[in-house]
Amino acid sequence: MFDIIKAVIIGIVEGLTEFLPISSTGHIDLVNHVIKLSQSQDFINMFEYVIQFGAILAVILLYFNKLNPFSKPTAKARNATWQLWAKVIIAVLPSVVVGLPLNNWMDEHLHTPLVVATTLIIYGVLFIILENYLKNKNAHITTLADITYQTALLIGLFQVLSIVPGTSRSGATILGALLIGTSRYVATEFSFFLAIPTMVGVSILKIGKYLWQGNGFSGEQWAVLMTGSIVSFLVAIVAIKWLLKFVQTHDFKPFGWYRIALGAIVLLVMFI
């Protein structure tokens, strides 16, 4: 019963932070240091990533018509949707090439409060610096159609940075997109779309690794996994709608300051 309650809390954290540029994995790592599940470490490692699938389902639900080429009434519209998917796949490729070989090493060595706190602060500072730089500049990529295949690849290269815990997948992609001239709204939406193949792939990889190690799922573990995923799905719907509305009238500096403050608090707790 206590693990179900913990799964609800972790699911809320995941749903709130997956698409905000503040690192969902970093937040979950920190939460797990306070209310760690009473399960094996193998299950916990898998759980942290697989509940992200619930958040991804929120994107699929909210953008189903926009991302479904078969729902388009004209050949031109269908072709535009297929092109968008092609750009998403191109953007994901760098993470596949770099992330897969380093996955196990990252899990074993970098999931620590010190690493999370450090990356929270570094990218918080970068967001503030970048937003100050962009203050009087106009974006030249203002629609998803404006994103070229080359631009998609560049954004995908930035996503590779998120393999370090605390960086934030959405944060890295949004930061990169802003840097190359994408509007905040389009950068945010494209980051959502990149999450679909990226996190579905990671979830499958983590489940496969968990089973390959000879583990199975008890009834309680299934309940914990489903609870966390469902809660993250529901909360992510709210978070996505809120973020899209927020970026239409605000920049990302508040997230930068939040990252710096949280990172500093973690460091203080560690060393005091």
UniProtKB/Swiss-Prot annotation:
EC number: 3.6.1.27
Membrane topology: Multi-pass membrane protein
GO annotation, biological process: cell wall organization; peptidoglycan biosynthetic process; regulation of cell shape; response to antibiotic
GO cellular component: plasma membrane
InterPro entries xref list: UppP
Transmembrane feature ranges: 2-22, 43-63, 82-102, 110-130, 185-205, 224-244, 252-272
Compartments where located: Cell membrane
Catalytic reactions on record: di-trans,octa-cis-undecaprenyl diphosphate + H2O = di-trans,octa-cis-undecaprenyl phosphate + phosphate + H(+)
Any one GO molecular-function label of the UniProt entry: undecaprenyl-diphosphatase activity
Keyword annotations of the record: Antibiotic resistance, Cell membrane, Cell shape, Cell wall biogenesis/degradation, Hydrolase, Membrane, Peptidoglycan synthesis, Transmembrane, Transmembrane helix
Enzyme type, top EC level: hydrolase
Listed Pfam families: BacA
Physiological role: Catalyzes the dephosphorylation of undecaprenyl diphosphate (UPP). Confers resistance to bacitracin.
Any further remark recorded for this protein: Bacitracin is thought to be involved in the inhibition of peptidoglycan synthesis by sequestering undecaprenyl diphosphate, thereby reducing the pool of lipid carrier available.
Family: Belongs to the UppP family.
Name of the molecule in the record: Undecaprenyl-diphosphatase
Species annotation: Lacticaseibacillus paracasei (strain ATCC 334 / BCRC 17002 / CCUG 31169 / CIP 107868 / KCTC 3260 / NRRL B-441) (Lactobacillus paracasei)
Lineage: Bacteria, Bacillati, Bacillota, Bacilli, Lactobacillales
